[in-house]
Amino acid sequence: MQDQVNATPEPRRVPWNKGKLTGAKPPLRPKHVWSIRTKLQIEGRARDLAMFNLAIDSKLRGCDVVAIRVEDVAAGGYTADRATVRQKKTGRPVRFELSEQTRQAVDDYLRSTGKRPGELLFTGRRGPDRSMTTRQYARLVSNWIGSVGLDPRLFGTHSLRRTKATLIYRRTGNLRAVQLLLGHTKIESTVRYLGIEVDDALAITKQVDV
């Protein structure tokens, strides 16, 4: 009885996601991409512009974006039309095209920093030989998104990864191509990642006539 009287109740554990919006983060719309890109250009944020454009074009996970090395995209001193990066999660290489504006942004960034092959493309506060952390990258993404009037809680690093993949799927309906571009091993993963519903599939089917 005495033990029951003196017993103190355990503090209630606060759920990690309390007050946070969870679930899949939606892709950015083209107008949002252009707004962020324009703002970064006007503000002269060369690193952020190069990173944002690379994230959109590459469709890489955040952990792979921050691990990009100069030689991955600019082995010859100038940014190439195509690049190949080995994914940390799967160990599989994934190839992607780099648009002209992305190549220009990366070249401008390389000129301003003097970075050379053999170095990390994006470094953080831990020193020139250490990559930016995924947490730092996530904070940057939130900053970019909030700077154009969007709610950072609704979007995240995966929003950038999904953006171009979603546009490609909506315009072509080619799920296999999107699977390859995202580096997924199973097409079911791509279906879930894009949030494809039966209605979406049927709408695409109606456009195909044989």
Predicted regions and their residues:
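Conserved catalytic core of the tyrosine transesterase superfamily
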Residues: M1-V210
